[in-house]
């Protein structure tokens, strides 16, 4: 298992409030690592990248279509996207080299998912990633 995959498992899934997670390489626009059983299609990668490329107001208004579900965007800025669909959600944090993607499901606390994902993003930014 790679260092990055261990980082995802320990810092995100270890909280028990992140269902699945992935790192997407910004430059290559490809998946780098994922948690076991989590597949992110190329169309989903494009959706997340476009969420940051658009004006944040437009992203908030339009929402996100991720993993075959429509999500209402509750936060969109230069570094973070938060979106929800009923009792599930996706949190995306942008660093210099990666998008950190985390999902949560029913029974999990979205606030814990957000905090863990933002902290991992901050750690990667400090490391120059």
Swiss-Prot record:
Keyword Cytoplasm among UniProt keywords: yes
Alphabetical UniProt keywords: Cytoplasm, Developmental protein, Differentiation, Lipid-binding, Spermatogenesis
Function of the molecule: Involved in male fertility. Required for manchette development and acrosome biogenesis during spermiogenesis. Binds in vitro to phospholipids, including phosphatidylinositol 3-phosphate (PtdIns(3)P), phosphatidylinositol 4,5-bisphosphate (PtdIns(4,5)P2), phosphatidylinositol 4-phosphate (PtdIns(4)P) and phosphatidic acid (PA). Contrary to other profilin family members, does not bind to actin in vitro.
Protein name per Swiss-Prot or TrEMBL: Profilin-4
UniProt GO cellular component terms: cytoplasm
Reported tissue expression: Expressed in testis, in germ cells in seminiferous tubules (at protein level).
Location within or outside the cell: Cytoplasm
GO biological process, one term: manchette assembly
Disruption phenotype: Homozygous knockout males are infertile, whereas females have normal fertility. Sperm from knockout mice display severe impairment in manchette formation, amorphous sperm head shape and flagellar defects, resulting in reduced sperm motility. Sperm of homozygous knockout males displays a significantly reduced acrosome reaction and decreased viability.
Family, similarity comment: Belongs to the profilin family.
Gene source species: Mus musculus (Mouse)
């Amino acid at each position: 298992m790679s260092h990055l995959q261990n980082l995802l498992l320990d810092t995100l899934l270890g909280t028990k409030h992140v269902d699945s997670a992935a790192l997407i390489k910004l430059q290559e626009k490809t998946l780098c690592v994922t948690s076991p059983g989590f597949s992110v299609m190329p169309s989903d990668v494009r959706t997340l990248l476009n969420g940051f490329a658009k004006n944040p107001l437009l992203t908030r208004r339009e929402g996100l279509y991720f993993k075959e579900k429509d999500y209402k965007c509750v936060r969109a800025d230069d570094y973070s996207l938060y979106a929800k669909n009923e009792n599930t959600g996706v949190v995306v944090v942008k660093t210099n080299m990666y998008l950190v993607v985390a999902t949560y499901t029913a029974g999990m606390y979205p606030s814990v998912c957000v905090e863990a994902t933002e902290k991992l993003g901050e750690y990667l930014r400090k490391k120059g990633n």
